[in-house]
Regions:
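Alpha-helix-loop-beta-strand connector modules within alpha/beta enzyme cores
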Residues: 95-99, 194-213
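Mature N-terminal, pre-catalytic/accessory segment of carbohydrate-active enzymes
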Residues: 1-23
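Short helix-terminating capping/connector loops at secondary-structure junctions
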Residues: 5, 39-42, 101, 207-211
Length: 225
C-alpha cells in the first residue's frame, strides 16, 4: 500500500466549467493557463472529468445508455471527435505528454465498475479467459449514471480487469485518478460502503501498474446518517 499524499492535490477539474463535455482544446487551454498563472502557487493537476469516452456528452446532463468508445478488452477509451489526438489507439498519451511538458500532471475521472455496453456485448478482458458478463454485478448500479455495472470482486477475471485498466492508464501517463460512485450503490442503500471491495482492487491495481498515481475517491450522492 502506498503512502497517503502529504496535502490535498491542487489543480483544476473540467467538470466545474464544462460538465461532461470538455474537449481536447479546452483541456489544454486550461492547462496552459495553469502553467502561466497558477503553477507558481503550487497548482499542478489537470483533471479530465466524467464521460471522456462519450462522443455526444455535453454539459451536466447525461445521455442514458449512450454508445461509448471502448476497446476490445472492455476498457473505455477517449472519444476521438472530442480528443482528436487519441486516434489510432493513442489514448490520452498525447495530451498527457503535452501537460507533462508544461511541468504539470494529468488526471482522469472514471466510474467504478465495468461498462454495461461491455457486459451486453460480453467482450473480452485482457489477461484472462473471463469475459465482461462473468465479472459484472448487475445489481450494483449507479443511481445517477447508466454507463457502468459494478464488478463482483469474488469472480475470476475481476482482478485482471482492474489490473488491465490501470496498466492502460499508466501507459497513457496518468498521474491522478478520480473514481466516482464509490459509496453506496442503488440496491444497497443500507450499506454506505457497498463498493469497498472494488476500492481494494483499484488500489492494488494502481500499485501493480508500474506508475505512481494519486487515487481520489468520490462518493457520489451518499447518505450522511
Amino acid at each position: 500500500m502506498k503512502d497517503f499524499i502529504k496535502k490535498p492535490p491542487m489543480g483544476w477539474n473540467s467538470w466545474d466549467c464544462y460538465g461532461a463535455g470538455v474537449t481536447e482544446d479546452e483541456l489544454l487551454g486550461n492547462a496552459e493557463f495553469m502553467r502561466d498563472r497558477l503553477k507558481q502557487y503550487g497548482y499542478q493537476y489537470v483533471v479530465c472529468d466524467i464521460q471522456w469516452y462519450e462522443p455526444a456528452a455535453k454539459g451536466n446532463v447525461y445521455n442514458n445508455f449512450a454508445d461509448l468508445c471502448m476497446d476490445e478488452y472492455s476498457r473505455l477509451i477517449p472519444a476521438v471527435n472530442r480528443f482528436p489526438s487519441s486516434a489510432n489507439g493513442a489514448g490520452f498519451k498525447p495530451i498527457a505528454d503535452k501537460i507533462h511538458s508544461m511541468g504539470l500532471k494529468f488526471g482522469i475521472h472514471i466510474m467504478r465498475g465495468i461498462p454495461r455496453q461491455a457486459v451486453h456485448r460480453n467482450t473480452r478482458i485482457y489477461g484472462t479467459t473471463a469475459r465482461a458478463r462473468d465479472i459484472a454485478s448487475q445489481f450494483s448500479l449507479c443511481p445517477w449514471n447508466t454507463d457502468m455495472y459494478g464488478v463482483d470482486t469474488e469472480k475470476r477475471g475481476a482482478e485482471e480487469y482492474y489490473d488491465s485498466l490501470f496498466k492502460l492508464y499508466a501507459s497513457w501517463g496518468v498521474d491522478f485518478v478520480k473514481v466516482d460512485d464509490i459509496a453506496n450503490t442503488e440496491f444497497s442503500p443500507q450499506n454506505p460502503y457497498s463498493a469497498e471491495k472494488e476500492i481494494e482492487l483499484i488500489r492494488a491495481a494502481i500499485d501493480r501498474s508500474g506508475r505512481d498515481m494519486v487515487l481520489s475517491l468520490s462518493p457520489g450522492p451518499a447518505p450522511l446518517n
